[in-house]
Design a protein with these regions (language model features):
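Mixed-charge, Lys/Arg-enriched low-complexity segments
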Residues: 36-93
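Negatively charged, low-complexity tracts enriched in Asp/Glu with abundant Ser/Thr
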Residues: 1-12, 33-37, 89-93
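Short beta-strand segments and strand-loop junctions that repeat across beta-rich extracellular domains
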Residues: 19-37
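Domain-level signature for proteins that mediate thiol-based redox and metal-cofactor handling
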Residues: 1-3, 24, 51-52
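Short, surface-exposed coil-to-beta transition loops
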Residues: 13-17
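A general, composition-driven signal for non-globular sequence regions
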Residues: 9-10, 24-26, 70
Length: 93
């Protein structure tokens, strides 16, 4: 399953194309700066990326586009983990 979208690169402000792909129960993210460019793998997903993936899965689920409830639960768990890591990283010590 693939979910594609675009956003702005937080470092440069340039438009970038993103892809979240689930294969064998594992999510991988990749990006590119040009529409027809090569994909760069190994992107570490942010909270916003997980929120976008969850939103897209929930939309597809109601249309039955190959999304199962287990997929949504998995992404919700990964999003909760990303939120916890973000809170730990941003907490004042």
């Amino acid at each position: 399953m693939e979910i594609k979208w675009h956003d702005s690169d937080p470092e440069t402000g340039q438009r970038r194309f993103l892809c979240a792909e689930r294969f064998a129960g594992v999510w991988n993210f990749r990006w590119k700066l040009q529409r027809r460019g090569e994909w760069t793998r190994g992107l570490e997903p942010t909270r916003a990326m997980w929120e976008h993936v969850l939103d897209m899965l929930e939309r597809r689920y109601w249309r039955r586009d190959g999304v199962e409830e287990a997929d949504i639960k998995q992404v919700k768990n990964l999003l909760a983990k990303a939120i916890r890591q973000e809170e730990i990283h941003n907490s004042p010590d």
